[in-house]
């Protein structure tokens, strides 16, 4: 690519005849491929150009793309680096054993974007992440039949992603610069696609386009656990407790909008928005909330920050939506008894568990706790959510109630013969919904309701997802070294996430109600899964360990994931939500795995310290809903179903991974040399299909009447250009497949 400013401006319909001195790539028919864009010199505004009597055509820079060609090999902007440190130390004090350990890593990586490789790679995505963990495990032996275990741990994970050139400098994301060679010299306000050449139609991100979003998150988790075990006659008694406490912060926004807002008022072009410039632009009254309103429109998510990215000050503030970090706590206490009689083993257990998210929600019934119904009536002033309410005790936000549950577990096993054992288990379980669905920032809620766009808001009052599971099966010993297990299972789950409109919601401002209609995550979906699983296992014999398993299953429910109803809520009604139990997106009828691991039993010889591992996996296709054929390139619209929900099946999946390794000694250090081959058979592994055809790389539109008409028009205009093939290029982008055969050669060194 040659992006040097040309001295003479060519005409708008400029097409190279090869005499301009630039080198152009050619397509398979010999046609030159190029792309021209215009960028105003020194990034002057249109108004400045019109007011400049000396403005001439040469004040426009023409960015000329040359050497466009198909390339294969390593993907640009797809590198990553990770440095990991592990360490542990064990101390033995007789009955007391202690183990100290730590792990840490530092990561930085880019993400390949097929649409940016022609001109937008200078402003690509980058992610930086850090993880640290430390733990102390202790075990104290009380007697030969009893012991106590305790554990303390802390881990912190922090990740930041954004534009690789600026990352944390949010105002720089959208700011044009005048320094030649700087990343934002050719900054584009819009990053939409542009034709690569006049005789082609598929688009790429134009030169100067920048990654425009910023996001940073940090989670610190402290865990303490205690377990006691004692064998008393026929009883193996266990009891214990654990507490997990988290602190979660996050901040994210469409960062390029900050500089764009400043540019609206920046009359002296110093890159700043002074108080006087804001007053001149918005008036005295408008200036008071100018900054807030501009940030709110960027759909800021803030937790432990205010809307501007300032860290938690210790006090909630409605003016700038300062919010405290999230501090959820989960605790569990359990007691279990395993009764071992001559002909039967019975396991009885019960756990008492709590989930306290610490999240805030409006209190609709004045019982002192926030609840989901409270979101039907919210108090606003100055276009802001006000968690303090109207000053008369109404619309006040309070902490949601702590969730508690008692979960029984029962297991029974007894021998049918000297080689066969029957087993049956029953238990109830729960899990908190993902934290990302629980914590709602005021700025995002304000934008979701007032901006009028189709959105999906988090819900601090979501309840945990609950399930009840039954298992029954047998285990058969085969010879002296192998066993076969056959087990049937049935699982019912409820309170899964769903998305629904609040059609009877109101916002109150100064005593006046305004009806709103907005979508929020709620509990509601149900799921049932059932199936049969078999597992064959052979203990290591002459160095060989083998395992094979197969599962037949079916998963049905009213929704596969929380946002599945997004298009229904977009319509704005309260009708059309799924009520029937359909096959779920992740329903997979057949899955199977085979593991072979051989470790040389010889201490000396050619194969000493050598190992071989093979893992083969197979899965029948997951589900999708067949839909009408349309152009996924030209038409930006919803899919219209052509069959029952999830009645289509994606292609089956198969994979074979191989690894050979050998331990060697290097000057007193222990090293392990290895060769790993992933997807050794180079099987096609499909991530998604076009729902009109069930094909990974073909949406079926070119074969339709409208597609054929388009193709005829293209061929009449450019008979030497294979329009059908170029349309296909827009469909068959790399992310639709999993990785091809990949070989890694490495060396692990331990010291």
Give residue spans per PLM region.
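Transmembrane beta-barrel strands of outer-membrane/channel proteins
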Residues: 1-3, 100-104, 150-154, 239-245, ...
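Transmembrane beta-barrel wall of Gram-negative outer-membrane proteins
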Residues: 1-108, 126-148, 351, 408
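C-terminal beta-signal and adjacent terminal beta-strands/loops
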Residues: 9, 23, 603-609, 613-637, ...
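Signature of Gram-negative outer-membrane beta-barrel scaffolds
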Residues: 72, 76, 211, 238-417, ...
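Hydrophobic, lipid-facing positions within transmembrane beta-strands of outer-membrane proteins
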Residues: 81-87, 130-136, 152, 220-226, ...
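Short loop/turn motifs that connect adjacent beta-strands in outer-membrane beta-barrel proteins
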Residues: 92-95, 143-147, 231-236, 419, ...
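Membrane-embedded beta-barrel scaffold of Gram-negative outer-membrane proteins
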Residues: 149-153, 415, 421-423, 427, ...
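Gram-negative outer-membrane beta-barrel transporters
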Residues: 489-492, 497-623, 748
């Amino acid at each position: 690519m040659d992006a040097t400013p040309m001295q003479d401006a060519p005409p708008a319909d400029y097409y190279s005849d090869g005499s301009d001195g630039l080198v152009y790539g050619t397509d398979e028919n010999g046609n030159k491929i190029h792309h021209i864009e215009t960028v105003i010199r020194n990034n002057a505004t249109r108004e400045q150009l019109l007011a400049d009597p000396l403005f001439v055509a040469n004040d426009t820079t023409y960015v000329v793309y040359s050497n466009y060609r198909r390339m294969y090999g390593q993907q640009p902007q797809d590198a990553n680096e990770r440095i990991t440190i592990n360490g542990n130390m064990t101390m033995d004090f007789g009955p007391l054993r202690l183990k100290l350990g730590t792990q840490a890593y530092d990561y930085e990586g880019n993400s390949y974007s097929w649409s940016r490789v022609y001109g937008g790679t200078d402003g690509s995505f980058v992610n930086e992440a850090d993880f640290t963990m430390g733990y102390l495990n202790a075990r104290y032996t009380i007697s030969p039949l009893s012991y106590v275990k305790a554990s303390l741990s802390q881990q912190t994970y922090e990740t930041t992603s954004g534009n690789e050139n600026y990352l944390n400098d949010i105002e720089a994301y959208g700011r044009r610069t005048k320094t030649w060679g700087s990343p934002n010299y050719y900054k584009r306000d819009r990053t939409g696609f542009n034709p690569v050449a006049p005789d082609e139609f598929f688009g790429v991100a134009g030169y100067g386009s920048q990654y425009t979003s910023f996001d940073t998150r940090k989670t610190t988790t402290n865990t303490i656990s205690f377990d006691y075990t004692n064998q008393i006659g026929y009883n193996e008694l266990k009891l214990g407790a654990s507490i997990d406490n988290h602190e979660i912060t996050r901040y994210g926004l469409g960062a390029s909008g900050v500089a764009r807002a400043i540019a609206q008022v920046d009359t002296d072009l110093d890159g700043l928005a002074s108080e006087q410039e804001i007053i001149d632009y918005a008036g005295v009254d408008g200036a008071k909330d100018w900054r807030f309103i501009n940030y709110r429109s960027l759909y800021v998510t803030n937790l432990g920050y205010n809307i501007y990215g300032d860290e938690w000050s210790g006090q909630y503030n409605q003016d700038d939506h300062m919010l405290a970090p999230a501090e959820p706590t989960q605790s569990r206490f359990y007691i279990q008894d395993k009764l071992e009689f001559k002909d039967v083993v019975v396991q009885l257990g019960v756990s008492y568990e709590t989930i306290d998210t610490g999240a805030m929600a409006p209190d609709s019934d004045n019982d002192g706790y926030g609840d989901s119904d409270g979101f039907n009536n919210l108090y606003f002033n100055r276009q802001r959510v006000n968690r303090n309410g109207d000053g008369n005790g109404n619309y006040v936000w309070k902490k949601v109630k702590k969730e508690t549950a008692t979960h029984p577990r029962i297991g029974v096993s007894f021998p049918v013969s000297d080689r066969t054992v029957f087993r049956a288990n029953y238990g109830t379980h729960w899990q908190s919904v993902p934290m990302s669905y629980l914590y709602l920032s005021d700025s995002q809620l304000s934008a979701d309701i007032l901006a009028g766009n189709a959105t999906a808001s988090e819900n601090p009052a979501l309840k945990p997802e609950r399930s009840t599971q039954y298992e029954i099966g047998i285990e058969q010993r085969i010879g002296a070294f192998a066993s076969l297990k056959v087990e049937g299972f049935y699982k019912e789950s409820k309170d899964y996430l769903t998305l629904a409109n609040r059609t009877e919601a109101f916002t109150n401002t100064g005593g006046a109600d305004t009806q709103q209609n907005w979508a929020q995550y709620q509990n509601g979906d149900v799921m049932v899964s059932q199936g049969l699983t078999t597992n064959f296992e052979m203990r290591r014999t002459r160095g060989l360990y083998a395992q094979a398993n197969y599962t037949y299953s079916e998963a049905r429910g009213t929704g596969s994931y929380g946002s599945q109803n997004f298009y229904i809520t977009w319509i704005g009604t309260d009708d059309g939500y799924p009520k029937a139990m359909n096959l779920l997106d992740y329903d997979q009828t057949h899955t199977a795995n085979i593991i072979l691991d051989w470790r040389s039993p010889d201490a000396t010889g050619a194969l000493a310290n050598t190992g071989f591992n093979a893992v083969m996996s197979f899965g029948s296709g997951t589900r999708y809903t067949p839909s009408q054929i349309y152009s996924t390139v030209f038409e930006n619209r919803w899919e219209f179903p052509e069959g029952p929900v999830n009645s289509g099946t994606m292609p089956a999946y198969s994979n074979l991974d191989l690894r050979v390794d050998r331990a060697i000694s290097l000057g007193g250090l222990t090293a392990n040399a290895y060769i790993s081959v992933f997807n050794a058979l180079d099987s096609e592994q499909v991530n998604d299909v076009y729902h009109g055809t069930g094909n990974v790389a073909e949406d079926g539109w070119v074969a339709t009447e409208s597609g054929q008409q388009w193709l005829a028009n293209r061929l009449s205009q450019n008979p030497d250009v294979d329009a059908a093939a170029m349309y296909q290029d827009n469909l068959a982008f790399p992310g639709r497949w999993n990785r091809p055969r990949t070989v890694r050669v490495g060396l692990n060194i331990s010291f």
